Amino acid sequence: MKVLSFLIRQDHLLYLDIFAKQNNLTRSDAIRYAISVLDEESTPVSLVGFPGIKLVRTSVKLAENVISRIDRLAILSKITRSDVIRNAIYHLLINNAPKQLPPVTAQTEKKYGYVCPYCVSRFPTVRALKIHLKRRHNGFPWCPVCYKPLKNKNATNHFRRFTDPQHQFWYMISRKRYLSSHRKEAVKQ
């Protein structure tokens, strides 16, 4: 076993841990599984990057045969080990997100507050989250559920198309009228 250090998006690391917990795996096992899926499917490793997304450095213990698989994929695609691991995790999340992975924001409001999907900052109210999204991330650069790139104008329409609770949650937040109606309710109380 060797310790391998790599860079990963903070929210993807959180989703990976949720996936591992749901399937009774360790983080290392989840990464090994993601690499094997990527290798067996012979998926061409395409770089998945979103500008302005913070990457964090993390380390895992992996067997030498897994590291050699990572190196082989890295050499074939002419990218780094970190890129291979990031892509393997990304593909794992893409395939499992709609069915198995709850969005970070689905956790209870009282305990966690609302979580920004892009930088994993926590906010006590929807209003605070919405203001943060507008100022810091210029709205919704990509869908937090299915990772599809979005333009700000079509974000609300994208969320409205889907009936699953995850997309509906973001539809509720992306609506323009949500803030004003919420303010009126607060005034009434």
UniProtKB/Swiss-Prot annotation:
GO molecular function, a single term: zinc ion binding
Any one GO biological process: regulation of DNA-templated transcription
The keyword Zinc is annotated on this UniProt entry: yes
Mapped zinc finger ranges (C2H2-type): 114-137
InterPro entries per the UniProt record, alphabetical: CopG (IPR002145), Znf_C2H2_type (IPR013087)
Domain of life: Viruses
Protein name listed in UniProt: Putative zinc finger protein ORF189
The organism of origin for this protein: Acidianus two-tailed virus (ATV)
SMART domains reported for this sequence: ZnF_C2H2 (SM00355)
Cited PROSITE patterns: ZINC_FINGER_C2H2_1, ZINC_FINGER_C2H2_2
Keyword Zinc found: yes
Keywords recorded for this protein, A-Z: Metal-binding, Zinc, Zinc-finger
